[in-house]
Amino acid sequence: MKQERRRKRQPGPPRLELVVAHPREEEMAGLDGGGDAEEGATHARGGGGAPPPWREQLTARGLVASLAVGAMYSVIVMKLNLTTGLVPTLNVSAALIAFVVLRGWTQALARLGFAARPFTRQENTVVQTCAVACYSIAVGGGFGSYLLGLNKRTYEMAGEDTEGNVPGSYKEPGIAWMTGFLLAVSFVGLLALVPLRKVMIIDYKLTYPSGTATAVLINGFHTPHGDAMAKQQVNGFTKYFAMSFFWSFFQWFYSGGDNCGFSQFPTFGLKAWQQTFFFDFSLTYVGAGMICSHLVNLSLLLGAILSWGVMWPLISDLKGDWYSADIPESSMKSLQGYKAFICVALILGDGLYNFVKIVALTIKNLFDSSKLKNAKKGEDMPVLDELHRNEVFTTDNIPSWLAFSGYLGLTFIAVIAIPMMFHEMKWYYVVIAYLLAPALGFCNAYGAGLTDINMAYNYGKIALFILAAWAGKDSGVVAGLVGCGLVKSLVSISADLMHDFKTGHLTLTSPRSMIIAQAIGTVMGCVISPLTFFLFYSAFDIGNPEGYWKAPYALVYRNMAILGVEGFSALPQHCLQLCYGFFGFAVAANLTRDLCPPKYGRWVPLPMAMGVPFLVGASFAIDMCIGSLIVFTWHIIDKSKAALMVPAVASGLICGDGLWIFPASLLALAKISPPMCMAFRSTN
């Protein structure tokens, strides 16, 4: 019975992290209202002994495992960032891989006759936290968006004659300055809300659904029944990892040229292929489609049909009328401008609506909780298990003086270092950002605890527009992009830390070991992510709108900064009217979903997801929908087996295909080309 209960609470595939993440209905339904999830965590605890001291939760083998898992996922998410810009949350997958690595290590030592330290849920939690902190830098460090938007190629793509895109307003990527920038901005968020952790987790009892889901998964692993369950998942992961890796290896032999290989297979005919409608055999995106909700995947497909199936062919027919026929379609004054700015309109409409909604919800819940606290004072007595969790959570305190002094010290370093890297970024911009960071971080962390939506990218976009307009024409683009990264990093890490604290609270893990693991993982990420980025940047044609490595959000963010400087004068002819329409559609779609009954509202497409294919193309949306179709069919055939195995199989597909990128990039750097080109042409 207990095993069945745990299986029902097994976290569903995690949500897709778009610029604003939308929580999955399936995930929220199983985790809403912390009581049931916490009960599941308690039942899974089993044994009931005292947790090990915080120093024993941080182990050398755990840090090595964190480094391996974090580095592997950094490569995977960097590939996703530089192709479509869409990265699914991989926390559940990381927890599974951490368990696989360390359980395999302890079992191997036992077979060799060596006594190994027991592998506890606390160590598993610390390893997962450290690994996620490491690859989160690759996800949110701006390598496919605001930092890449600073390079010369994106500057040229935005139009050298575009108003606001002034000559010299670019900075080529460099390992040294990127590492320094990440180190300067990534740690302050760790310290901003440490003194409020008890308030957020214990007093307000915020659910943090992703953190709770990870805790339930980890607790489930560390039970007698969990071993059998984990063994099935490990076998599924290993099988599909190997299949995905060798399929990618096989494809490489046929990709020796432009538009060659299985990734350019005209599945629906050459006419559809010209409009990017084909299946490109990318198992990474098939796996991502298995993790993401059906609504996200269908929204992607709808956006692809609307843009590449209808709008772009129609606008192309107006060449010479709406825009000059003498300029290439890649110019921002041509078709590319419509693609970029309409995508921006959808992103801004969706982001602004969700920003206002979450802030309003946060204020309302803070007000309601303060009234309930006074009304119910003394009525509810915590159960024994909750008291035990609370005691562990408050035992190993992080001194407030250390958090405050660390925050001030890091602020001082950033105020000096960031203007030295970017002369357009004045020191007082940095001071203002760091003064506002605790308040913004609290709002974001509180909203994430209620809804599982991390609004950091929207705070960053608001900072981008404000700083771009404030800095003016000569410095606005660079100041806006850098300020966006600064605010986004400060706000995002605070919410991530609270998710981790929730996981630690439910697995009886010391908060001191959690924050140390987060700090170590952040250091790893600040070093590994720039190195990983440069591996891709040196080996592949990053930012080519006609190639595989489009990195679409670099151009999107630069165009946002240009809009902040110049306003609507930067738009091509009739583009403003289209942008108004799509901005209004994004707001209306969100309102409809929130106001309609759930059985109708859940079918309303997500504007953020619809906007991504506008720049990237339709092929990856088809991959994602194939992943959705696999999950849908599997649930019809065997629902309980699908709930158990989908995360493991999807992780195997993503990791196998993603890991092949490492040898492929080394072959490209060594100037070793594939021996064959498989291409298709019409018989006419």
Curated annotation (Swiss-Prot):
Q: Does the keyword Membrane apply?
A: yes
Q: Which GO terms describe its molecular function?
A: iron-nicotianamine transmembrane transporter activity; oligopeptide transmembrane transporter activity
Q: Where is this region: Disordered?
A: 1-55
A matching Pfam family: OPT
One of the GO biological process terms: seed development
What membrane topology is annotated for this entry?
Multi-pass membrane protein
Family annotation (InterPro entries): OPT, YSL-like
Query: What does the UniProt keyword field contain?
Result: Membrane, Transmembrane, Transmembrane helix, Transport
Domain of life, per lineage = Eukaryota
Kindly indicate whether the keyword Membrane belongs to this entry: yes
Please give the family membership noted in the entry.
Belongs to the YSL (TC 2.A.67.2) family.
User: What role does this protein play?
Assistant: May be involved in the transport of nicotianamine-chelated metals.
Protein name, as recorded: Probable metal-nicotianamine transporter YSL9
Task: Give the originating organism.
Answer: Oryza sativa subsp. japonica
